[in-house]
Swiss-Prot record:
Gene: NPVF
Main location: secreted
Protein name as annotated: Pro-FMRFamide-related neuropeptide VF
Superkingdom, natural source: Eukaryota
Membership in a protein family: Belongs to the FARP (FMRFamide related peptide) family.
Phenylalanine amide carried by residues: 92, 131
Location of the protein in the cell: Secreted
Secretion signal, residue range per the UniProt entry: 1-21
Length: 196
C-alpha cells in the first residue's frame, strides 16, 4: 500500500473542488459561459415534440353546473335525546334504565351495577385438565377454601398463631436476661424433642 504524498493529496483536493464548483456555476443561468447564449440554452431546454403529456383542460361554467346535482352531501347521523337530558352526564340525574334496555344491562361488569352470582362461572370456560377432568370456577374456589381451612387447623399453624398472639417475655418477666418470646421458645423446644 502506497502512502500518498502531501503534494499529491493537495493537488487531488484542488482538482476535485474546482470540478465541483464549475458544475455548480454552469447550472446557474447568470454565470453561464459565453460559448452558448441564453437563447440557445432556452431553445435546447424546451422539450421536443409531444412526449405523451396531455394538455390540461380548463373547465367551463356549464360543466361545473352539471356536477352540482351529482354530488350529494349526506347529513351526519345524530342520536336524538330529549332536550332535558341531552347535556347532563349520568351522575347528574340521568338513569341507566332510561337509555339502556335490561338486555344491555346483562353484559355490564360488576362495577357498573351488574350483580349476579354465576357471573364468575359464566366467564371462566371449562378447560380440560390432566386425565380428562374439567374444573369450573366453583370447584376451584371450593378447593382453595378447603385448603385454607385445613391449614388453619394444623398444629404448626396453631403454634405460629399462638406465638404471634402472646406477649413478649420481657413484659411478663422483666428480670430475665433471655428476651425471646415464649411462643418461639415453645416451638424451639418442640423441635428439639422431635429431633431426639
Amino acid at each position: 500500500m502506497e502512502i500518498i504524498s502531501l503534494k499529491r493529496f493537495i493537488l487531488l483536493m484542488l482538482a476535485t473542488s474546482s470540478l465541483l464548483t464549475s458544475n455548480i456555476f454552469c447550472t446557474d443561468e447568470s454565470r453561464m459561459p459565453n460559448l452558448y447564449s441564453k437563447k440557445n440554452y432556452d431553445k435546447y431546454s424546451e422539450p421536443r415534440g409531444d412526449l405523451g403529456w396531455e394538455k390540461e383542460r380548463s373547465l367551463t361554467f356549464e360543466e361545473v353546473k352539471d356536477w352540482a346535482p351529482k354530488i350529494k352531501m349526506n347529513k351526519p347521523v345524530v342520536n336524538k335525546m330529549p332536550p332535558s337530558a341531552a347535556n347532563l352526564p349520568l351522575r347528574f340525574g340521568r338513569n341507566m334504565e332510561e337509555e339502556r334496555s335490561t338486555r344491555a344491562m346483562a353484559h355490564l361488569p360488576l362495577r357498573l351495577g351488574k350483580n349476579r352470582e354465576d357471573s364468575l362461572s359464566r366467564w371462566v370456560p371449562n378447560l380440560p385438565q390432566r386425565f380428562g377432568r374439567t374444573t369450573t370456577a366453583k370447584s376451584i374456589t371450593k378447593t382453595l377454601s378447603n385448603l385454607l381451612q385445613q391449614s388453619m387447623h394444623s398444629p404448626s399453624t396453631n403454634g405460629l398463631l399462638y406465638s404471634m398472639a402472646c406477649q413478649p417475655q420481657e413484659i411478663q418477666n422483666p428480670g430475665q436476661k433471655n428476651l425471646r418470646r415464649r411462643g418461639f421458645q415453645k416451638i424451639d423446644d418442640a423441635e428439639l424433642k422431635q429431633e431426639k
